[in-house]
Amino acid sequence: MKEAIKWTANHMPKSGDQQLPVMSLPNVAKARFFHSSFPQYSITPLAQLDGMAKYLGLGGLFVKNEAHRFGLNAFKVLGGSFAMARYIAQEMGRDVSEMTYDYLTSEAFRQEFGQATFFTATDG
């Protein structure tokens, strides 16, 4: 027997979220360009879940398994690495699109930026 999908409407008032500009299409393109500059980057394939799609009455259902992104057992690396690149670009008065893997691992970058230590955390 199929169980009905449960959902709840969001009745919270819309507000001016000051962080939304970071999700604009130009900024998303910069994030994609940044991550694709890494030699370890590869497109994560979609897994097709035919049985679940049929059970839910959908024509198709696809998911991405980001657990092995960049050879790591975590998917959160994308946000952390891009946040660091944005911070570095801001500190240097440059655009994040200039912060490629090759540049960030170069001696020229080390000479110009110096040293920094970054910490990231996860609840998982």
Where are these regions (language model features)?
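PLP-dependent amino-acid enzyme catalytic core
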Residues: M1-D123
